[in-house]
């Protein structure tokens, strides 16, 4: 049937062919045939009706609404077309138009309840929760012949949705759970319940219902290809079919990704996104596109920004999009872009940014041009949040004293939410002093916040870093670095390489060389095992540890040992040379060359020869390795031939020859 045109269909077979295409869910082909037929008979009721149905199934709701509008004009006595038009307009997010059309049917008893349900859905989508609740309660109280067990169930589900939107997650869970028990398994209800559990932080229960949705989806619809992309099988798009929508698989995988992301299981979050049924990028729904942008930001930031910017032009877009785009601009220090987006979308700030988030972003944007003013703004936010934290601490204590478990849980959740707001404010303040290399003031800030943050992983890590940077507090730094490393000791490569390097340096600086060597042996063993399991994978942890140690000795003026350590850390070059490792290595070489040019140090010929040989190896293996990772959204790109390790290693070698007076 592929490519079948209207002219190829035998006389009298047209209707049968169209119905077969619809039966087989080949709606796009049916649309082509019906479009051709309607050019010949533009007033055909059957043609317009089938075309509207096909457009609706293809989720082309605006086009479906046009078909039903024409039918309503051609056959005003058939009011069902107005209802279909209103439903299609609602699905197209054209809420005022949908409301206007639905009001024309309100006085018709045959459609009264269906119109009320549609109007409740419209008000819910417009965030008019009181209006939606009034209509839902009216439906539940009215009853009538159109009412019954199913409508009662729908009413309870609708109340659950309203409770969820109002932030009453536990009450919403009760409604959805009761509805699920009454109806038996339904993917949409299971998803609603999982979402309510997620929002009330019952992640295990949410994951249980997500697993149910996925299990049912795989068993009932193996053709949807769940998990195929993750295991590397090349599969074609399953499209945005009604079946896919009915399974709630896309929603379930997105929610699983959100939970794993919240729990900082980032690999599992990415897996959840690739496990969902495969679709082409242009077929992706806004939530999936948003989540892809966020979860692949570290690996593909340019693509992530493009996706979020694209979503911002769509109506509607996930409500988190606006805030997340602005926060990411600030994280990547594109403060000008953040300021532009805020200025160009002032109408969105009131709808999508909380007062806290707006004030925080305003302070972050100010950091670039007026750090002192930004610090004052951040300090105001910090003061407000610490006051809230103290009040919530008292509430938790009182609830525990009264043995009120529900009140304890509510207060603890509020405390954790407030702390997650406070940490970024504190870190933004600290960064202002950090950029000025005023490390004692950073430490002072962290000490002031110890009563709230002493158990927070971000706070502990940054305290360790600021103690390390002061060069006379290595022992205190060890006290913060060690618990981080010991927590992941069995999977030590899950710890950031710079944390391991700083801990080793701290050991060395207080003469605990045995501890440093033991840690390095542990890293080496894990790298060997990983290299055995995956020979092509580049692993840089031990390399970076040695580079940092080598850098330390160079900084202390012991270039003979320091440079040799740097060179050995990058052996073999074909496995250890990368943008990050080259960054550390070239800093040591530049420092060495500067001191040699000033005649403040003398190197043995054997060390110079070792340096030249090392740079030649870098030249050989660095052709495809960027010397610098360019700014994600930088308009002026570096020359492609100059931004390589090969080019920079040649420059360093030429400088060595020039300084020591060798002929090249």
Curated annotation (Swiss-Prot):
GO molecular function annotation: intraciliary transport particle B binding
Keywords, comma-separated and alphabetical: Cell projection, Cilium, Cilium biogenesis/degradation, Coiled coil, Repeat, TPR repeat
Localization per Swiss-Prot or TrEMBL: Cell projection, Cilium
Transmembrane segments: none
Keyword Coiled coil: yes
Keyword Repeat tagged: yes
TPR repeat start and end residues: 11-44, 45-78, 153-186, 188-220, 385-418, 423-456, 458-491, 543-576
Record's GO cellular component terms: axonemal microtubule; intraciliary transport particle B
Family according to the record: Belongs to the TTC30/dfy-1/fleer family.
Function description: Required for polyglutamylation of axonemal tubulin. Plays a role in anterograde intraflagellar transport (IFT), the process by which cilia precursors are transported from the base of the cilium to the site of their incorporation at the tip.
Protein name (database record): Intraflagellar transport protein 70B
Native organism taxonomy: Eukaryota, Metazoa, Chordata, Craniata, Vertebrata
